[in-house]
UniProtKB/Swiss-Prot annotation:
General function of this protein: Binds to 23S rRNA.
Name this protein carries in UniProt: Large ribosomal subunit protein uL23cz/uL23cy
SUPFAM superfamilies cross-referenced by the UniProt entry: Ribosomal proteins S24e, L23 and L15e
SUBUNIT field: Part of the 50S ribosomal subunit.
One GO molecular-function entry: rRNA binding
GO biological process: translation
GO cellular component labels: chloroplast; ribonucleoprotein complex; ribosome
Disulphide-bridged cysteine pairs: none
Classification lineage: Eukaryota, Viridiplantae, Streptophyta, Embryophyta, Tracheophyta
InterPro entries hit by this protein: Nucleotide-bd_a/b_plait_sf (IPR012677), Ribosomal_uL23-like (IPR013025), Ribosomal_uL23/eL15/eS24_sf (IPR012678), Ribosomal_uL23_CS (IPR001014)
Length: 89
């Protein structure tokens, strides 16, 4: 799992879950085809489309943080990605 870092939960990403679209941050060097292949292989789903944009790194007092890419992955109807962490009761 070199490509995908973690899932993103913002107001927009939660709204997009209703359209069967999932948002996650990925490594900046990974390509769309690598991410698509990994998602289809690991989760067993079919990907229709992928949108991506690069987010800038943040400046620090000394140095900076690396930039990263955010992918919005659209799945075919009938497929979904299950939550990776179960809620504790």
């Amino acid at each position: 799992m070199d490509g995908i870092k973690y899932a993103v939960f913002t107001e927009k990403s939660i709204r997009l879950l209703g359209n069967n679209q999932y948002t996650s941050n990925v490594e900046s060097g990974s390509t769309r085809t690598e991410i698509k292949h990994w998602v289809e292989l690991f989760f067993g789903v079919k990907v229709i489309a992928m949108n991506s944009h690069r987010l800038p790194g943040k400046g620090r007092r000394m140095g900076h943080t690396m930039h990263y890419r955010r992918m919005i992955i659209t799945l075919q109807p009938g497929y979904s990605i299950p939550p990776l962490i179960e809620k504790r009761t």
